[in-house]
Amino acid sequence: CHLEDITRSDIYGFVIPFCVELMKLMDEYKIPIKIRACDTMGYGVNFPGAVIPRSVPGIIYGLTTHAGVPSELIEWHGHNDFYKAVNNSTTAWLYGASGVNCSLFGIGERTGNTPLEAMVFEYAQLKGTLDGMDTTVITELAEYFEKELGYVQPSRTPFVGSNFNVTRAGIHADGLLKNEEIYNIFDTGKFLNRPPLVSVSNTSGLAGIAHWINSYYHLPKEKWVDKNSDLVKKIKVWVDAQYEDGRVTVLTDSELVEEIGKCCKELNITI
């Protein structure tokens, strides 16, 4: 049963009495009746002290305690109109809903629904395990959507955007070189097949250039270059010259590869 627009409804005047009657029918006919609490316009909040009908904890509490709906038969259906789809879905879990409705990458009406990939990592953080889920599939799905459906993720989208683990600050890149955990949310290479990257610009510094070379060429750790490398220093001079001439955009991979090739020949080295 879809309880549409529940965050603007009369919870104790209609919703709870209605669900009580549904539970009676379930007991009489021995057929499970699933209750889907739909935050149709995204008005739900998880703030302590918030009152119904907007309180997500209050709604779930009312369904379980006063309507007698078993936890395993409660689902939360969220919308992202106020950027609360993920928070409210997680809150519904914590207060007794066993299911959360999701869509891949949050694609849905208006501002979208709860992203499936977000709830995968919410689950992992709550439970301390992925329970066998292969999260690298998230990256494969994003690539499929882009190549086959023409759907390009906004670059800053967590887990799937092109820039979600890319740093442009030289000091951050220096930290990545020394210890990836400092400036990467988790082992994105392991869990998403997306190692952290840096964009090379006038703010990247020597460390940023070194990290780009190590990442782009997939160099084994024993062959990593660092900010003391002659190659890195030579590339840095070239990068600085680009911006002194008025450039305002980050350097592309192809530009860097071409210049690195030239510098390697001049230095008589190979990567």
Regions found by a protein language model. Give the residues of each.
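A mid-to-C-terminal "edge-of-domain" accessory segment
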Residues: G128-I271
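Glycine-rich phosphate-binding active-site loops on the catalytic face of alpha/beta enzymes
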Residues: L94-P115
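Predominant activation on well-ordered alpha-helical scaffold segments within soluble catalytic domains
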Residues: I16-V20, P57-T64, T90-L94, L116-A124, ...
